[in-house]
């Protein structure tokens, strides 16, 4: 019961009250007085009411259509990357803009429809609330339901079946435009794709895994070149035709005590030396190799005096070629690039978290948070004198993960 003597009602008295009286009582108990309320359309069937309903319905309809369009674009429109000159490029260029346009319009039109509904249909009302302290009254349990019912009745949404349905559908679809993109974040990390220059999409593979499929992989040096500029009668344009981002390496290309970052270069994508073809365009495929998350390898040429001190890992005694050793450039801590090499100490350093690996001791960690040695890539020289991979890594590259046994 209420602690306010003036608001101390029995259950029988509350049962005798109408919904309107209970609603008014509820506002009074909350210290709120409805000073003014005016129906927008007091006369049933008022043409102005129908015009207002149509306006709101149009905006809800736009929201529904836009939300459906968003789902159609997201689910069915081609989203795979298309490069310059490839079929379907013009469709691909519209994919992201259409997602933004349809999702934005769906949410915006739903909001505009709600605003119009409030401004044009819900009764005009002025309420005054008084400040008061203390806990809520027990009687509030009875009046809150009446207040909600009163709000529903005064909104007139209950008898506007079409608008009610459109608002519900629009709200659900607008919500889907927010929830649906989250599906793109759900990925099975062990779902294998087609094995390519970047692996098959799982943590077990890299571009070097192609060696297991019989693909000859050269150790490719990054030249850093980009598309070449051409001047023609129609203007200036850039082309990658005849441009080689990765080229093959010979042992003599690397000085003693030096390090070079190399990437897998399949024989079919070679375009240098005696295999150079000015009309070939392998630039994009070579860039895919450079961008492979587990492809980067450090090729180190030790001094002859240091090479005699090397401690080989059991089972990997023949992974090197003379003074040349190839270690994964992906730190075994959390996958940062181990991009520094101290020629005097023969240590490989990860600048991110200061892990250090001994190049003379099969890439074993000697300092920092890394707990495992850098995987070593077996290398050799082919009949033409170029450095090639003699096999794949015998362990996963990069940091630890749950399924890894070591």
Curated annotation (Swiss-Prot):
UniProt membrane topology term: Multi-pass membrane protein
UniProt subcellular location: Cell membrane
Keyword Nucleotidyltransferase: no
Transmembrane segments: 56-76, 98-118, 166-186
Cofactor(s), names only, from the UniProt record: [2Fe-2S] cluster
Quaternary structure and interacting proteins, as annotated: The cytochrome bc1 complex is composed of a cytochrome b (QcrB), the Rieske iron-sulfur protein (QcrA) and a diheme cytochrome c (QcrC) subunit. The bc1 complex forms a supercomplex with cytochrome c oxidase (cytochrome aa3).
UniProt function note: Iron-sulfur subunit of the cytochrome bc1 complex, an essential component of the respiratory electron transport chain required for ATP synthesis. The bc1 complex catalyzes the oxidation of menaquinol and the reduction of cytochrome c in the respiratory chain. The bc1 complex operates through a Q-cycle mechanism that couples electron transfer to generation of the proton gradient that drives ATP synthesis.
Protein name (database record): Cytochrome bc1 complex Rieske iron-sulfur subunit
Organism: Corynebacterium diphtheriae (strain ATCC 700971 / NCTC 13129 / Biotype gravis)
Gene this chain is encoded by: qcrA
């Amino acid at each position: 019961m209420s602690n306010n003597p003036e608001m101390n009602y029995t259950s029988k008295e509350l049962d005798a009250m109408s919904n309107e009286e209970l609603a008014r009582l509820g506002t009074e108990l909350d210290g709120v007085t409805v000073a003014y309320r005016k129906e927008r359309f007091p006369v049933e069937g008022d043409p102005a009411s129908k015009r207002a309903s149509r306006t709101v319905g149009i905006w809800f309809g736009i929201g529904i259509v836009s939300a459906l369009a968003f789902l159609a674009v997201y689910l069915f429109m081609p989203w795979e990357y298309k490069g310059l000159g490839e079929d379907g490029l013009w469709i691909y260029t519209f994919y992201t803009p259409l997602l933004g346009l349809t999702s934005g319009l769906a949410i915006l039109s739903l909001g505009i429809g709600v605003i119009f509904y409030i401004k044009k249909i819900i009764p005009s009302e002025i309420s005054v609330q008084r400040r008061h302290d203390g806990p809520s009254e027990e009687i509030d349990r009875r009046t809150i339901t009446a207040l909600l019912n009163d709000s529903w009745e005064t909104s007139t949404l209950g008898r506007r079946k079409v608008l009610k349905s459109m608002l519900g559908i629009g709200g659900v679809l607008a919500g889907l435009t927010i929830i649906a993109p989250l599906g793109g974040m759900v990925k099975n990390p062990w779902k294998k794709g087609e094995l390519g220059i970047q692996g098959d999409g799982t943590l077990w593979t890299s571009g070097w895994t192609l060696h297991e499929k019989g693909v000859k992989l050269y150790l490719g040096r990054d030249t850093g070149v980009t598309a070449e500029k051409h001047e023609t009668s129609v203007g200036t344009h850039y082309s990658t035709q005849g441009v080689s981002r990765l080229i093959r390496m010979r042992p003599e290309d690397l000085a003693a005590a030096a390090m070079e970052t190399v990437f897998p270069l399949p024989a079919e994508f070679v375009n240098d030396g005696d295999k150079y073809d000015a009309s070939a365009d392998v630039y994009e495929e070579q860039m895919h190799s450079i961008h492979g998350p587990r492809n980067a390898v450090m090729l180190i040429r030790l001094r002859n005096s240091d090479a005699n001190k090397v401690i080989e890992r059991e089972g990997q005694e023949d992974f090197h070629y003379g003074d040349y050793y190839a270690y994964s450039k992906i730190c075994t801590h959390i996958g940062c690039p181990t991009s520094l090499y101290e020629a005097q100490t023969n240590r490989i350093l990860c600048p991110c978290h200061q892990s250090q690996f001994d190049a003379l001791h099969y890439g074993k960690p000697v300092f920092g948070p890394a707990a495992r040695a850098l995987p070593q890539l077996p290398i050799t020289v082919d009949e033409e004198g170029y450095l090639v991979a003699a096999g794949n890594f015998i362990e996963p590259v990069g940091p630890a993960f749950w399924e890894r046994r070591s």
